[in-house]
Swiss-Prot record:
It holds the Pfam family cobW. The gene is ureG. Belongs to the SIMIBI class G3E GTPase family. UreG subfamily. Facilitates the functional incorporation of the urease nickel metallocenter. This process requires GTP hydrolysis, probably effectuated by UreG. GO terms for molecular function: GTP binding; GTPase activity; nickel cation binding. GO terms for cellular component: cytoplasm. It comes from Cytophaga hutchinsonii (strain ATCC 33406 / DSM 1761 / CIP 103989 / NBRC 15051 / NCIMB 9469 / D465). GO terms for biological process: urea catabolic process. This is Urease accessory protein UreG. GTP binds at residues 42-49. Transmembrane segments: none annotated. Keywords: Chaperone, Cytoplasm, GTP-binding, Nickel insertion, Nucleotide-binding. Homodimer. UreD, UreF and UreG form a complex that acts as a GTP-hydrolysis-dependent molecular chaperone, activating the urease apoprotein by helping to assemble the nickel containing metallocenter of UreC. The UreE protein probably delivers the nickel.
């Protein structure tokens, strides 16, 4: 069976969905074949790549990690990570989707699966993989065939209406990150409104306010990711967030 046939499906969403109805990790998931994989998605310009860089820098000396980025016709995000020395060049693969970023993380994930398999060949002992989606709309959401845990990044520059506009990314991501909170006063965005609406849209699904430029919120983000990994692997933690 080809990867195209294995990882191709079409979904139509009748509603934004609910946090407790989100896809869960597949029962037959083999973490020895592919390490625990985290998806980072969100609209264009919300700070996905900036956060991925900060996360990589925080974890790279403590864990064996690697990254796949998605762009439509360039490898801009991969080049950004390499230029800023988030990881060594061989640990970063840029995928050019050639079309809708949404499709590459859900409807047909084969390009990203190829890239992840290549990273596993290069680094058989890798512990944590990341897939950053290309910037897309609020309907974009990762397939659980591709990732085990999803982080959806929005920012305040789109206005405080964004959380209540919904979309599967906002309602069903494992973690919602509201970035660039320092810009709220410039665009008249009310953080209390965003907090209220995030709770309404996500129920008790976790969300947090963050600021990538100075790493505000990074400990919480990493804790959510590593806790999910530990739970999925049913293993005791073998690392800490901070160097001793």
């Amino acid at each position: 069976m080809t990867l195209l046939k294995m990882y191709r499906h079409l979904d139509h969403f009748d509603s934004p969905g609910h946090f407790h109805h989100r896809e869960l990790i597949h029962e037959k998931r083999n973490f020895k074949k592919r390490a625990f994989t985290v998806g980072i998605g969100g609209p264009v310009g919300t700070g996905k790549t900036a956060w991925l860089m900060q996360i990589c820098k925080a974890l790279r000396d403590k864990m064996n990690i690697a990254v796949v980025t998605n762009d439509i016709f360039t490898s801009e995000d991969a080049e950004f990570l390499i230029r800023n020395e988030a990881l060594s060049k061989d640990r970063i693969i840029g995928v050019e989707t050639g079309g809708c970023p949404h499709a590459a993380i859900r409807e047909d994930v084969s390009q990203n699966m190829y890239a992840l398999e290549e990273l596993m060949k290069r680094f058989p002992d890798v512990e944590l993989l990341f897939v950053e989606s290309g910037g897309d709309n609020l309907a974009a959401h990762f397939s659980k065939e591709l990732v085990d845990y999803s982080v959806y990044v929005i920012d305040v520059s789109g206005g405080d209406k964004i959380p209540r506009k919904g979309g599967p990314g906002i309602t069903q991501a494992d973690l919602l990150v509201i970035n660039k909170i320092d810009l709220a006063h410039l665009v008249n965005a009310d953080l209390s409104v965003m907090e209220r609406d995030s709770k309404k849209m996500r129920g008790d699904g976790p969300f947090l306010f963050a600021r990538a430029k100075d790493c505000f919120g990074i400990d919480e983000i990493i804790n959510h990711i590593l806790t999910a990994r530990e739970k999925a692997l049913e293993a005791k933690p073998v690392y800490s967030l901070r160097k001793e």
